[in-house]
Amino acid sequence: MHKRVVDFIKKQYLFTLACTENNLPWANAFYYVFDEKENRLIYITGDQTHHAKVLRNNSRVAGTIFVPTKFVPSLQGVQFTGRSSQLFSTQAEQARALYKTEYSHHLIDQLTVWQVELEYVRLVDNSLGLFSTIEWRKGQVVEETDHYA
């Protein structure tokens, strides 16, 4: 993944997650940590929530990570697609430990750990020029050259 995209995702802390069941959309906001090595977002939630039940039947998701602004020249944000799944055993323990490097509230150990395995990411960054975008797809080899530097 391009360094600018990684840096943006790592700097933020909240994402929206959209899922569907029977053609009915549902969206939520979650605090997350980014696992750069695995290109995934780690989040926690209750296992009996509506979205958790939906995700068990349809893991395909879309989402956004953005910095709210009314000033168009400073607009920055990510749109993504991927697959979300609950983690168990060692995977859950490792992901929970990563999550705890950023968050410390008492519910972390009581909730289930989930991931979004990113498959497509599109960064819109107007600081690079109006409506400038950088895209990444799972499996893509990324150039090290930053054409925006």
Swiss-Prot record:
Leader sequence segment: none
Membrane spanning stretches: none
Protein's UniProt name: UPF0306 protein PM1958
Family matches, as InterPro entries: Pyridox_Oxase_N (IPR011576), Split_barrel_FMN-bd (IPR012349), UPF0306 (IPR011194)
Organism from which the protein derives: Pasteurella multocida (strain Pm70)
Gene3D superfamilies recorded: Electron Transport, Fmn-binding Protein, Chain A
Similarity field: Belongs to the UPF0306 family.
